[in-house]
Amino acid sequence: MSDLKAAALRALKLMDLTTLNDDDTDAKVIALCHDAKTPVGNTAAICIYPRFIPIAKKTLREQGTPEVRIATVTNFPHGNDDIEIAVAETKAAVAYGADEVDVVFPYRALMAGDEKVGFELVKQCKEACGDILLKVIIETGELKEEALIKKASQICIEAGADFIKTSTGKVPVNATPEYARMMLEVIRDMGVAEKVGFKPAGGVRTAEDAAAYLAMADDILGSEWADNMHYRFGASSLLTNLLNTLEVTDQVADPAAY
């Protein structure tokens, strides 16, 4: 197997296959669940709006892939600084049956100099999650500056985040290798690689993109680190490219680019 094919197979099994569009329907989510089951293995998870969790759970069970995790989003996509609403949404997501919650960090508050609200929001959302995985989206493409990206990453980790995630996919600039490096370096420098993972989201579209991101993680945190409890790709159009790279052709087309 070529290096690119090996990276494509690895990336496929680390995907949070995503649809977070205003026109999502039960039918689209059912199709997403079908796409998560491929001839070369399943994606790690699907990522959907909370209201679709019951139909997704049913579909994954019926197609024999109950191990595919269901991630959902809260405080999404704007990252407001209302802790009460973020926590209420997170509790509702857990009640719906989410396996993982991707919450948006109040990044604009941090840009305005408020570090406390972000810490408290993440801390309380993690308390609401209990053992359920909490990924925190810091919106790197809006923070832009290295100091802010690293500060947001540190705050999330100190507050109990299980993963730090680049982006919502809803702003002009989403994951970039530069932003990924900054966040991975925080995980390394804080000595939390055993318990904190990383998720680039939005803009990872090809096997070559995925291979470069994985090579960076291997370089910074070691070649064994990026397993499915420490690394995810938030993407949709990536899956088709990975399957094409792996020469798998009988897969349904997946949702709009993320």
From Swiss-Prot:
Pathway(s) served: Carbohydrate degradation; 2-deoxy-D-ribose 1-phosphate degradation; D-glyceraldehyde 3-phosphate and acetaldehyde from 2-deoxy-alpha-D-ribose 1-phosphate: step 2/2
EC number: 4.1.2.4
Example of a GO cellular component annotation carried by this entry: cytoplasm
Keyword annotations: Cytoplasm, Lyase, Schiff base
Protein's cellular compartments: Cytoplasm
Highest taxon of the lineage: Bacteria
Catalytic reaction(s) noted: 2-deoxy-D-ribose 5-phosphate = D-glyceraldehyde 3-phosphate + acetaldehyde
Xref: SUPFAM superfamilies: Aldolase (SSF51569)
Main subcellular localisation: cytoplasm
GO BP: 2-deoxyribose 1-phosphate catabolic process; carbohydrate catabolic process; deoxyribonucleotide catabolic process
Record-annotated disulphide pairs: none
Residues forming the catalytic site: D102, K165, K199
Enzyme's top EC category: lyase
PANTHER family reported in the protein's UniProt record: DEOXYRIBOSE-PHOSPHATE ALDOLASE (PTHR10889:SF3)
Function: Catalyzes a reversible aldol reaction between acetaldehyde and D-glyceraldehyde 3-phosphate to generate 2-deoxy-D-ribose 5-phosphate.
UniProt similarity note: Belongs to the DeoC/FbaB aldolase family. DeoC type 2 subfamily.
Name assigned to this protein: Deoxyribose-phosphate aldolase 2
